[in-house]
Amino acid sequence: PSIDTVRPDARVHVFLDETTATLYLDTSGESLFKRGWRFDKGEAPLRENLAAGLLALSGWQPHIPLFDPFCGSGTILIEAAMISLNIPPGINRPFAFERLRNHDSRRWQDMLDKSRLHIKPALEAPIVGIDLDPQAIDAALSNADRSGLDPTCLDFAVGDAVSTPPPSEPGFIVTNPPY
């Protein structure tokens, strides 16, 4: 049979130890932290799942204003907007199981459509990010656009964290500071 070794229909992993061989069928494909929207990265990119984890650990809730004074390519704020709007992570990315022979594409599409019914139309509170680097802000805007978010949903601007006050009070600051 003809097999595409770069992008096979099914990827099988074999793990061996002294007495056992374990076979795994890869149903995810790309790593799950890859949500399918972040192509533009800053100097110190933060994985999308780590950004979502930081937000969860911070105690931030969608009804509370959020500010990132070192937003870079916007990962934390885009994840926050997606959480706030109830957009499932990875809803727009392909998965490896979609190429499997017994995949029911109609059922999968029905599940995606049902999950989209729960997406909220607007944020409950402002989500604002600034960065000194205009290229980082351009990257954040591009990433937000690719994520499917309404461009007016997030407020990205070039600014200096030292001289720019948070846009509203009270609120949360969640950031990945430069080092």
Task: Describe the role of every protein-language-model region.
Residues 14, 140, 176:
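Residue-level signal for inorganic ion chemistry
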Residues 21-23, 74, 171-172:
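Conserved active-site beta-strand-loop modules that form the wall/rim of enzyme catalytic pockets
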Residues 162-174:
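A short acidic, Gly/Pro-enriched loop at the edge of an enzyme's catalytic core
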Residues 18, 161, 177:
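Residues immediately flanking
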Residues 143, 173-179:
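Amphipathic alpha-helical repeat scaffolds
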Residues 46-165:
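Conserved S-adenosyl-L-methionine
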Residues 7-9, 17-18, 61-63, 123-124, ...:
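Short, well-ordered loop/turn elements at secondary-structure boundaries
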Residues 1-55:
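Non-catalytic, mostly N-terminal accessory regions of nucleic-acid modification and defense proteins
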